[in-house]
Amino acid sequence: MKPKALTVLLLGALCAGSASAQTGAKPKLVVNIVISQMRADYMDRFQDNFSADGFRRFMDQGTYFTDAHYNYMQTNTAAGLATLSTGTNPDGHGIVAEDWIDFTTNNPVNLIADPSVTGLDCDAGVGCYSPLNLTAATLGDRLKESDAKSKVVSIAATPVSAIVSGGHTADVFWMDAGRGHWISSTYYFKQLPTW
């Protein structure tokens, strides 16, 4: 993604009222929604179509960024998500793309491929993913670090988006495009929760 063309929409909805936010009380819920390459003006343009308890609530009570930029080139989805979720640049989180060449071995590296884990509820060889190459903690990791009772869930259509956004300690799920249902890996669970 090109920096000028990239519009990142980050919504943080804090269910605690604004008065409790001013007193420093911990929010009961933090929701982080990233819509890659969505034009920021769409939030204002379509606000009349949003319900009071949906995106309209995010706009009124949360925070959204209409002009987010990265201070590095060349941006791409994986590096951008890692920067958003960790608060650091690629030299800090280790993600430069979904695939790259390790200059020390001249071997290709996939961001999330991890032969030490197994995909859950999917065909053999599918879903063998983890945050193996993500070298920084995400916001979710920090939330769990500060309070072990925190619930951190990352859900996305693709494993890269789910894993990079969720980090090391979240409950992470992504869509198995071949079978059309949510899956994860043994990095995150021994077995999938019953739905």
What are these regions (language model features)?
Residues 17-21:
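Sec/Tat signal peptide C-region and signal peptidase I cleavage site
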Residues 27-39, 58, 84, 143:
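Beta-strand elements within well-structured catalytic alpha/beta cores of enzymes
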Residues 34, 38-42, 51-55, 77-81, ...:
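Stable alpha-helical elements in mature extracytoplasmic
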Residues 23, 30, 35, 43-50, ...:
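Extracytoplasmic/periplasmic, Sec-exported soluble proteins
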Residues 7-16:
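Bacterial N-terminal signal peptides
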Residues 88-195:
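His/Asp/Glu-rich, glycine-adjacent segments
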Residues 43-92, 151-155:
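Short, structured active-site-proximal loop/turn typified by the sulfatase FGly-forming signature C/S-X-P-X-R
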Residues 1-5:
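Positively charged n-region of N-terminal signal peptides that target proteins for export
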